[in-house]
Amino acid sequence: MPRFSVFERSVLLDATPAEVYAFHEDPRNISKISPPSLRVERVECSVPATAGGEFRLRVSQFGLPLEWTGVWEEAVPHGRLVDGARKSPFRHWRHSHLFADVPGGTLMTDRVEYSLPLGLLGRLLDKTVMKLVFTAMFIARHKATRQFFFKEKLPGE
């Protein structure tokens, strides 16, 4: 059984679980929330997400082109979306998007289970760099997602 690392981060969003789920089930929205260091060049997918459905991404991370083929492993409307990778820069990748209805909106939790290739070098990078990379990426993604769902009330509404 492969060993993997886990990264997890949550954010409170001013939206219903149905709204947040609908946004995340469309992989084309990744370009709306990706940090500048991750440029989305191409997205091929079918919407809505269904278990077993595939999507393909071409991204550029720090100037390096990366091809990604993902598959929706689970698609539970308004509850969770789980994607795995058939082709990616990772040896193992499983990303769960969990949506919980809470006072004030939706608590969305991103949980990433991953392992890097390159043997000992990959394990060293994981211990020294990956937490920083994931933290920076998900801070940026969650900030952009909060801004996307921010609902400012006008006077008199």
What are the residue ranges of the model-derived segments?
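Beta-strand/loop substructures that line and gate deep hydrophobic ligand-binding cavities in soluble
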Residues: 85-136, 156-157
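Glycine-rich portal/gate segments that line the openings of hydrophobic small-molecule binding cavities
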Residues: 41-88, 107, 143-157
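Hydrophobic pocket/interface hotspot
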Residues: 20-24, 30, 55, 72, ...
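Short, surface-exposed coil-to-beta transition loops
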Residues: 6-8, 65-69, 92-95
